[in-house]
């Protein structure tokens, strides 16, 4: 098949996954705001950061990239720490989701040979355009957290500790 068609197909897939990531973020925000009070919403997103970070360990196991375990595990541990901080500090969620979006893009760029900050095999493989989907979701969520931070801080202060 012609290289032009291959590139066109890839661009269409990337655009679709980015749009789906944005739609997933919008749906998540809509449902969480409707179902959870502000304090619980913040805690939900903090725990969700931990879960989405753990996907990379699942990918490492699935794709059998043994050399990636050390780095991927260390990064997941860092996201767990950020997530735990994010349960109380909105700024940690903003930073955590932004960093996770960058982590997703690094994986996507390495998967396509466009850029690699690490040696071959240090990062796990990911499904096609997963990094684009997840980065779109993560960056949208970080922007939402920035907009929501004052309300979360007020809710935390209103509840006796």
Predicted regions and their residues:
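Transmembrane alpha-helical segments of multi-pass membrane transport proteins and ion-pumping complexes
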Residues: 22-29
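A generic, lipid-embedded transmembrane alpha helix
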Residues: 48-62
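Hydrophobic core segments of alpha-helical transmembrane domains in multi-pass membrane proteins
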Residues: 71-77, 95-98
């Amino acid at each position: 098949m012609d290289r032009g068609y291959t590139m066109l197909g890839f661009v269409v897939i990337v655009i679709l996954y980015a749009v789906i990531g944005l739609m997933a973020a919008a749906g998540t925000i809509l449902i969480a705001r409707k179902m959870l009070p502000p304090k619980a919403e913040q805690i939900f997103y903090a725990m969700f950061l931990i879960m989405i970070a753990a996907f990379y360990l699942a990918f490492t196991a699935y794709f059998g990239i043994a050399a990636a375990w050390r780095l991927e595990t260390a990064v997941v541990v860092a996201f767990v720490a950020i997530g735990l901080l994010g349960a109380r500090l909105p700024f940690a969620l903003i930073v955590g989701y932004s960093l996770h979006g960058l982590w997703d893009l690094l994986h996507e760029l390495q998967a396509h040979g466009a850029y690699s900050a690490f040696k071959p095999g240090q990062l796990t493989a990911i499904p096609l355009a997963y990094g684009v989907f997840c980065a779109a979701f993560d960056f949208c969520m970080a922007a939402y957290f920035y907009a929501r931070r004052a309300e979360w801080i007020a809710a935390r202060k209103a509840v006796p500790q």
